[in-house]
């Protein structure tokens, strides 16, 4: 769930997240128990409980990590000069985050009802704010509506294309390059 520039986690917490996402994808969130997660990990339920008190805590942890990657991207991008090279790098990092976190996004899509009961609305509002910030970084906060729409189209289409083609593409790097090219073409430096 981390792209280049962020620190990957190889600890128990990350392993729990990975296994939980696998089981949620296989069985659904509602049909997966903490016991099953612990069994797949090869640990006791008590050991799992030490890290996470509930499935909801696990979900919050991996969604928070995913959204934190976007926060880091926006914070970094705000410190950069507004150039074509920066714009391309911002889009490349964004595409990397989307590709790295595709399992999280799939979970969110497949388990909407469960997510709605988890008080996740604040997290999604925060994520929408980060997307607004990303658009500001790409075209400027005072850009005309046409430029902002082009930037949002580029960002949203890039994310959707990554998720749609990831399992269909033979070459993940080629997919990333194509999506980056498409997104970059949608946002000229001056509109």
Give the ranges of each region predicted by the language model.
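N-terminal intrinsically disordered/low-complexity leader segments
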Residues: 1-11, 164, 168, 191
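Helix-turn-helix
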Residues: 15, 19, 23-57, 61
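Hydrophobic alpha-helical connector segments
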Residues: 61, 74-106
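Short, basic, alpha-helical segments at the C-terminal edge of helix-turn-helix-like DNA-binding modules
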Residues: 64-71
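Amphipathic alpha-helical packing segments from all-alpha helical-bundle domains
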Residues: 71, 116-152, 177
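Short, hydrophobic secondary-structure boundary micro-motifs
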Residues: 106-109, 117
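Hydrophobic alpha-helical segments that form the core
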Residues: 144-166, 172-186
């Amino acid at each position: 769930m981390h792209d280049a520039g962020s620190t990957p986690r190889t600890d128990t917490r990350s392993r729990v997240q990975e296994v939980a996402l696998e089981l949620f994808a296989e069985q659904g969130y509602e049909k997966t128990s903490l016991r099953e997660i612990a069994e797949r990990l090869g640990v006791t339920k008590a050991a799992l409980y030490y890290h996470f008190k509930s499935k909801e805590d696990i979900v919050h942890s991996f969604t928070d990590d995913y959204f934190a990657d976007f926060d880091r991207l926006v914070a970094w991008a705000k410190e950069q000069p507004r150039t074509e090279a920066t714009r391309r790098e911002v889009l490349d990092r964004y595409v990397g985050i989307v590709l790295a976190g595709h399992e999280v996004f799939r979970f969110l899509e497949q388990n909407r009802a469960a997510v709605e009961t988890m008080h996740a609305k604040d997290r999604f509002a925060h994520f929408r704010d980060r997307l607004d910030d990303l658009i500001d970084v790409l075209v400027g906060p005072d850009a005309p509506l046409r430029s902002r729409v082009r930037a949002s189209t580029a960002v949203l289409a890039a994310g959707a294309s990554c998720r749609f083609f990831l399992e269909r593409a033979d070459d993940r790097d080629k997919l990333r390059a194509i999506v980056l090219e498409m997104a970059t073409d949608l946002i000229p430096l001056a509109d």
